[in-house]
Structure formats: C-alpha cells, structure tokens
A protein has these predicted regions:
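Short, basic interhelical loop/turn and adjoining N-cap
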Residues: 33-44
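General structural signal for secondary-structure boundaries
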Residues: 5, 39-41, 51
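N-terminal acidic leader/helix
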Residues: 1-30, 47, 54-56
Length: 58
C-alpha cells in the first residue's frame, strides 16, 4: 500500500511541476483527498501549497 501512495505522491508532484501549473491545485487536492482520505485534507493542502510555492520561486 505504501508503494502505491509513493507513486501517487510522485504523480501529483509531476502534475504540478511538469504541466507548468496547468492543473489547478484544487484538482490535485481533490484527487489526493480521494486517495488518502478526508482526515488528511489539511496536511494535503499544506503540502500542495508548499510544492506550488516552491515551483513559483524557481
């Protein structure tokens, strides 16, 4: 199960980085919440925002 989660995190990071922000963070958050559960939504939002901010700083 952890292997799948690592893969899914990598896919979400790829979507943010390689698609040049064409995929909105709202969509990525929604998909991650579906994958990991609503209890993790605050942490997911925080991580997605950190990744998004890091991309804008490059």
């Amino acid at each position: 199960m952890i292997h799948h989660r690592n893969r899914n995190i990598a896919i979400m990071q790829l979507a943010i980085e390689e698609l040049e922000r064409k995929v909105s963070t709202d969509i990525i958050i929604s998909v991650a919440v579906d994958e990991f559960g609503i209890n993790h939504k605050p942490k997911i939002e925080h991580l997605v925002n950190l990744m998004d901010n890091a991309i804008w700083e490059e």
